[in-house]
Every structure is written in structure tokens, then in C-alpha cells.
Amino acid sequence: MYQSNKKKRLWKEEKERLLNMTRDERRKEYREYVSLDKIPSLMEELKSKASSDDESPEEIQVKNSLCEKVSFYKGDITQLEVDAIVNAANTSLLGGGGVDGCIHRASGPSLLAECRELGGCETGQAKITCGYELPAKYVIHTVGPIARGHITPNHKQDLASCYNSSLTLATENDIRTIAFPCISTGIYGYPNEPAANVALTTVKEFLKKNRDKIDRVIFCVFLEVDFKIYKRKLNEFFPKDGGDDEEGEKGDSDEMKEDTEGKPQSPPMKKIKEKKEDTPAPDSPDEEYSAEEATGNTQDMTAMSLETNEGNDVSSPATDPLKEGEELSEAKITGEKISVEPKTPEPEDAKMTVEEKSQEQEDSENMETSQPKVSGETEDLDGDSEEPSDVQKEIASPSNETCQESDPKDTNDDANEA
């Protein structure tokens, strides 16, 4: 009992002594440290890059001041000389593996003694202690969710709460600079990239509402996989031309929502997708026509052939608009599609017979006052658009041959005479 009270008195006295020291005095208490001025902000990195590229740093106009409040560091978090570092702890707060064990070893036994008095911590919450032998003045302990590779909405909510609780606790204790490790990505099994999305999203939203309360947030990574992820995503979440207007914040919110789900898509890619137009597909060589268009085309070509033959001798070959040796003979109509079969050219006598029969039929129809007699041997080959009679409609139904040119019997007789 006496020993316990002595340890309690010791860590309390040590805490009071260290917190009352100035920075220069505290630097005598630890050997290695990385000061804040050695960790540039995103804004300072942009200016440094502009100088190396022979560009004027004054030309860089940053609308989103959050660039000045965010930094990226790869190394040991226990060496950062900031107001507070965040510890990815377990619920007992008594130390463990990973970054938790490193912080406890570097801070000395007084940290463990104070953590015993805190009574543990729930998932998503945070508690604060002194940094003791660390360059950091405070240690904020937070407990991340145990995902084991499978993320649920509760895991996302708990992880976001870790960052929110830590930042809130920092503002309550007048902490202006804070460094975060990658929470829950170790043995707790939270996937690295989705964890980075949650971290960046939550920190950005907090800084928007409390930009005057925090001077610098440092994302400290140790593994190469986390280094590559944060290196790529920091410029997406904290762009130099992000803007503070409502439209820009709305766009950031949509982007962050997608990134939090582990399926990031940058705004430039969205714009490219929106600008893509559907290009028309090239015409197929086997283009299909409707039955009406095919029938009209067949009649027009046949009429053209007949008009050409009117000024020529009967024995002279007719000019065929189709390829030599082919002629539309009949069309098989099936529904709305039609397939055309080639046929060898018929003798000129047969074509003349068709013309004479068509002329006789037309004269006969003009002279009759009653309903005209329709014969299967004749067909309107001039492509006229007159309304057919009921009898003609019945004959021109799909069950009959719509492109019939002449009676096969008469055609064979005329061919023999020739």
C-alpha cells in the first residue's frame, strides 16, 4: 500500500515538474527529437517545389488555408517535439505491441503509473496523460476498432470517433500541435487505405470548424505502404486550390464520401467521364431494312430498269442498277426484317412482257368503274404511293410474294420464242 502511494506521488510530482518547464528546459530531459520547424506543412512543400522548378513562390495562391495546418512525416512518432502525440492504445491503456509499446518504453514508467489511474478507455474514446520522458508534452491515448480485415459501418464510426475525440481533447487542453499514427491498421486489422480515408476525412472536417484552435496536424507513418497512400491522398483532401466556398466544400464532401468507402475517384476522372459522348457505331455491312423500305427500293430499281429499256432496242442489254449477273427476284418477308436472294437476269422479252402487261392493266383499271379485278400476274412496279384496295391489301399480305415480276409460265414461253 505504501509502495503504491509512493508511485502515485512520484508520477504526479514528475508530471507537475515537467509541465511547468519551458521548451528549452525540457530539451535537457530527452536526447533525440525532431522539432516542428523540421516538418514542413503542405503549403511549405508547395512553395519549396515551386522554387526548385524556377517558379515564383509568390505566384502560388492558396485559397484553402488548411494546407498550412497539415503535415506529413515518415519516421518515429516518439521523437516528434509537438504538444501531443496520439497513442493507438488498447482498452486497458497499460501498453501493448506496435506503437503503443514504443510510446510506453520511450516515456518511462511514470506513464504506465498514470495510465493505471485512468481505469481504461472505451473504443472510439480518448484520454490524456503527460508525455514524461518524451519530447511531446502530452500523450493522448485512443482505442481504435478491431476490424480483422472486415469493415462494418460501426468500425468506420468508431475510427472516426478516435480522431474526433483526440482533437477535441487537444483543444480542451490548449494543445496546438498534434501528431497522429495510423490507428487500428496494425494487429487490429483495419485495411490501410480505408483507414487513411477515414483519418483524412475526419481531420479535414474538424479543421474546417476549428481552424483557429489547431495550428498543425501531423500524419506520422512508419510503413512504406502507408507512406505511399498518404503521399497520394493528402493532395486530394487538402488541395492548394480547394477553396472555402460552399460549392467547393460540397464537392469535397462528395469526394470524401466515396473515399471513405475505400473506392476513391478523383474529381478530374469524374469530369472526363461526364465529357465522354456516345459515338455512333459504324454501319454494319449486313444492314437490315424494314419490309416497307425494302419493297420500295425493289420497285424503284425495277422501274428504273424499265425506263432505261424504253429508249433502247429490245435486243440490246438493259442497264441494271444492281451488279451484273444479279437481280432482285423475290423477297421473303418475316416480321419486320427482309432478306433478299440474288437471281440470274431474265431475258429482255420477259421484261418487255411485264411492261406491256403492266400498261394493259393500268389502262383497264382506268376504264372500269366497278372494283378492279386484281390478278396475281401483274404488280405495281412504278413505286406509286396510291392507297391499295382491300383486295390488293389481301393479296399483298406477307403470305404472298410482294416482288413478283411476271407469270413464270408466260416468261418461259416468251423466252423460248426469243
Swiss-Prot record:
Q: What is its EC number?
A: 3.5.1.-, 3.2.2.-
Positions with biased composition (Basic and acidic residues): 250-262, 321-360
Which NCBIfam families did the record assign? PRK00431.1-6
* Gene Ontology molecular-function annotations: ADP-ribosylglutamate hydrolase activity; hydrolase activity, acting on glycosyl bonds; O-acetyl-ADP-ribose deacetylase activity
Catalyzed reactions? 2''-O-acetyl-ADP-D-ribose + H2O = ADP-D-ribose + acetate + H(+); 4-O-(ADP-D-ribosyl)-L-aspartyl-[protein] + H2O = L-aspartyl-[protein] + ADP-D-ribose + H(+); 5-O-(ADP-D-ribosyl)-L-glutamyl-[protein] + H2O = L-glutamyl-[protein] + ADP-D-ribose + H(+); alpha-NAD(+) + H2O = ADP-D-ribose + nicotinamide + H(+)
Where does this protein have compositionally biased stretches of type Acidic residues? 377-389
Protein name, UniProt field: ADP-ribose glycohydrolase MACROD2
Q: Does the keyword DNA damage apply?
A: yes
Q: Where does the protein principally reside?
A: nucleus
Q: SMART domains per the record? A: A1pp
Q: Name one GO cellular component term.
A: nucleus
Residue intervals of the Macro domain? 57-238
Using the UniProt record, name the top-level EC class of this enzyme in a single word: hydrolase
A Gene Ontology biological process in which this protein takes part is: protein de-ADP-ribosylation
Q: Any known activators or inhibitors?
A: Subject to product inhibition by ADP-ribose.
- Kindly list the positions annotated as binding substrate: 75-77, 88-90, 95-100, 183-189, 222
Gene name of this polypeptide: macrod2
